[in-house]
Amino acid sequence: MLKEINEQPSKIKGLLEGQLTDSGVQEEIFGPSAPDIFKKVEAVQIVACGTSFHAGTVAKYWLEGLAGLPCSVEVASEFRYRNKVVAPNTLFITISQSGETADTLACLSAAKDSGYLARLGICNVPSSSLARESDLVFLTKAGPEIGVASTKAFTTQLVGLLMLTLILGRHHGLSSAAENTINNSLRALPDSLDSVMLLEDQIIEMAEDFDQKEHALFLGRGIHYPVAMEGALKLKEISYIHAEAYPAGELKHGPLALVDSEMPVVAVAPNDDLLAKLQSNLEEVRARGGKLYVFGHSAAHQELSLIHISE
């Protein structure tokens, strides 16, 4: 798993090559019929499981915030068993690392005759059932993922979903300036991830604080909430430590009652505005003897155990 974590910069660099050109993201990377389909999209439905569901939830913020498209994200094991109302010209998206997740494939099959505009599959395995059965396909090119917990597949899924957002945004009023800014951020992403890999010693030190803990809370606001969800899932999967994720503003609505010196609180807040909003949470956690760990950009808040990540 550690090997696959460290492969993320190179895998994302390889994914972007040839797909993000000087003129932007090429629509044809999703399939030859993609340009005709994408210009008709009026809504998006995303269905996935586990880590892929978290990637889809991040994409919801992008699709609604950048492309102005209503987007719903659901767990496949729930979505497949309920009655659905399909809005006109809805793009149906499934996400799966293996392309063989049973519940996700069942939803993909049912969507064929449910009135969706088209079915887009995002996966890592070209020969998978999901890739074969979808109308459009985006391959994440992360390479074989042997680790039990998804790492490089998750981040390459996010890159693919952001590129999709940029394409759909072109058809729904996203400015060229905004698109160029995001394109430049994508180009810089491999180097930014390289800098994150240099935090290994600090992360090991943090992990030692968790060694004897039995519970943990993960917090995030907005688009960072699903990232917190992914962090909690990883701690459960790999460390067998119970962890839950909450929107940061919800800490006082129940979870705070569980915080004590034996429950660390991890916050995902990679910008100064969100970090400032955590000050009241810090005081509440401290009052109960807990410790707050923050993944952020600012070193201004010395009271926090800050894991500094590049912007």
Where do the model's predicted regions map?
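Short alpha-helical basic/polar micro-motif
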Residues: 3, 233, 283
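Flexible, low-complexity linker and terminal segments
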Residues: 1-7
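Glycine-rich phosphate-binding loops that contact phosphosugars or nucleotide phosphates
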Residues: 36-174, 179-188, 268-307
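Active-site phosphate/pyrophosphate-binding segments
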Residues: 7-45, 126, 134-264
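A short, hydrophobic C-terminal helix/tail in secreted or cell-surface proteins
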Residues: 309-311
